[in-house]
């Protein structure tokens, strides 16, 4: 079978104006094309949709992944195409890929096989420039902080307690801890600093949670960049930075529209990581899709313990969105991985390891059903190495849990390979009522919120933290931030904070080692374990395989 990029480059794309008009009813005047196959949708048009009824929202999540990923994006695309094939008016909503993972381990993030979004190279490489705008807005604020200090520090900012970092959309471990403003007094006040990857930035989170330009500007102004020497918070609005930041973001905030290989609409907008941020595409894009479609399929990053938890406890809580069904993507290879099989042996049949690894899937199913009250269907993303015995064992085991299960072949067959999944999802939405609720209430203390997620979803015994972290949490509550939801930053490979603990571990502790206030995004980041907000490249980055051929075509994306 051809590679992902070969399939994408052979695709027959429709002009995006045609997709918008025929599939969504959007007139040309409301589109801002970026070439023939990408467009932004005007915010005036988005606002004009507010009184329309919403379609049905379907969340695609997954079991705890292997390092290779398990096909959430592929399944989201395949399910969206399948819904259209069975006569439903459906759109999909995805995050924009970050260049860090594209050039690092993933090599691309636009689906796979015959379940992709296109133009694939453009989507993976710069797209419409949204991430550049987000990085520029973040770095403008950083520059204004250091400039203010250099010119007398009227706000009395404590240079030891600046909480704002610069960002770049690249995996670059050398930038994690640096010293800036060296070289003499003309270059500013030297201090220790560092970079985050742009998808971990607060501006990215604000961008994805904002409902309008006005909301965006207010949230940017609420950012706490640090503290004064008498421990009072300093906001971006105190530096008069939020207006200029909003100017940089005003065009980026317009939702992006592209298409699948089967010429169905795809909204791709925003892209925070789910292990170190909240892991969902923009509220504006999701709400726009719901006004224009009967069914909207969206994904949340990594496993359900990270992406789905944050989709529900942060995005849904803040936006009023409510999913009607959840699809949990699982692969036989990942379940064997959770049963103890190493990566190089995952293509070999191993029923014992599969049985053992099923504990991971079972916990994710129970978490969604019991702690969020949502109906669940399991989608098995089929790989050619899966044996009949493994598929039969998995079907029986999931059936014993009382959840519907569908083997999907959208990677090889496109939407046709996910039609059975589409029918099951539609029937479940029609017949199985949801009892939607959150895993914690706004009124709970920050510590109790962390404890609820850790004990109910992760299988942990308790949450721990040293005295410094506990004191930070206490001060945040005293400052009026106790009603914010929490965003736990941890490894995606385990329910615990130890990536080596596979399956469904119990009896572990979740240790909070750092607390970050995201006052503009309106959540509190609790950093647990060894997770980094600036990743590094692997020993052999995907960048070594990405190139231009003699025709000027991109090769090596996958």
From Swiss-Prot:
Record's PROSITE patterns?
A: FTHFS_1 (PS00721), FTHFS_2 (PS00722)
Positions annotated to bind ATP: 66-73
Report the catalytic activity: (6S)-5,6,7,8-tetrahydrofolate + formate + ATP = (6R)-10-formyltetrahydrofolate + ADP + phosphate
Report the EC number(s), separated by commas if there are several: 6.3.4.3
Q: Which domain of life is it from?
A: Bacteria
Q: Which GO terms describe its molecular function?
A: ATP binding; formate-tetrahydrofolate ligase activity
Pfam families per record = FTHFS
Known pathway? One-carbon metabolism; tetrahydrofolate interconversion
* Keyword S-adenosyl-L-methionine found: no
List the residue ranges forming a coiled coil, or say none: none
One annotated GO biological process: tetrahydrofolate interconversion
Tell me the keywords, alphabetical order.
Answer: ATP-binding, Ligase, Nucleotide-binding, One-carbon metabolism
Annotated InterPro entries: Formate_THF_ligase, Formate_THF_ligase_CS, P-loop_NTPase
Q: Which NCBIfam families match?
A: PRK13505.1
- Which family is annotated? Belongs to the formate--tetrahydrofolate ligase family.
Mind telling me what this protein is named?
Formate--tetrahydrofolate ligase
- Identify the species of origin: Methylocella silvestris (strain DSM 15510 / CIP 108128 / LMG 27833 / NCIMB 13906 / BL2)
Q: Which gene encodes it?
A: fhs
